[in-house]
UniProtKB/Swiss-Prot annotation:
GO terms for molecular function: RNA binding. InterPro entries: NusB-like_sf, NusB_fam, NusB_RsmB_TIM44. Belongs to the NusB family. GO terms for biological process: DNA-templated transcription termination; transcription antitermination. One of its GO terms (cellular component) is cytosol. Gene3D superfamilies: NusB-like (1.10.940.10). Keywords: RNA-binding, Transcription, Transcription antitermination, Transcription regulation. This is Transcription antitermination protein NusB. It comes from Photorhabdus laumondii subsp. laumondii (strain DSM 15139 / CIP 105565 / TT01). Involved in transcription antitermination. Required for transcription of ribosomal RNA (rRNA) genes. Binds specifically to the boxA antiterminator sequence of the ribosomal RNA (rrn) operons.
Amino acid sequence: MKPAARRRARECAVQAIYSWQLSGNSIADVELQFLSEQDVTGVDVTYFRELLSGVAVNAAKLDALMAPYLSRQLEELGQVEKAILRIAMFELSYRDDVPYKVAINEAIELAKVFGAEDSHKFVNGVLDKSGPAVRRKR
């Protein structure tokens, strides 16, 4: 699959995980609604589904992995930043096919697109500190 299709899958995953975090609906319902309502042309839909299910199933583990590296409590994180960091932590922890630098760079780019003004700096800082340890713990 082309890198652009994976990037689009990550962009869609941020939006869907954000919705899941706020709505409390099941990840299956969020996925179904997202795929039926959004244009997924050029999206690696298989990877999108893997990100959604992987983050949903492992959310508590992913949160525990990132917590020591946060400058504030997990509950104080913005929902967009939390979604982006969960995706990056999932890729670093469970996806050997995603190079370390790719996972971090993609998360930074997602934060630039979807996050608040300086959230990409925050995401970069968290992943710069946590990335090596998280990848080693696999």
